[in-house]
Amino acid sequence: MKVSLIVATGRNGEIGKNNDLIWHLPADMKFFKDTTEDHIVIMGRRNWDSIPRKYRPLVGRENVVLTRSEDFSAEGATVFNDLKAALSFYNQSSERRTCFIIGGAQVYQLALDAGCVEEMYITHIDEEFDADTYFPKVDFSEWKSDVVMEHSHDEKNPYAFTVKRYWK
């Protein structure tokens, strides 16, 4: 099982404000959906809570929610209290799927600190945003990269962005 991370960030690593996204980019949302479909998505409880009820669980993916709360339940998702336990559980599966870490900031930090992330898909949005949540600092010199997609701003996507894949 491969562990990947997927995130969209502003120029300064911004990823959110008030437990919500700070941009609307349908082309990037399509990339996220297409990339994570048929795989496992691991997210923190606040990230789960930020998804509108009508869109959760995320369709076509096995949803996993990490929380410190022992009595938390999430309809349509599996709940774990520990990232390593979740990864161990899915690693024992015979299916060859990827576990995508989809946020938020604390879960990204946990995964990066654990050293389990083998690949990252980062959407770099060419704009600065007012934010209260940021992607953890990463030493990109330790990673190889290639460009997956470049998208100019248009009537549906107000900001230009580039999706890069990083791997070790």
Segments and roles (model prediction):
Residues 1-168:
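Enzymes that bind and transform nitrogen-containing heteroaromatic metabolites
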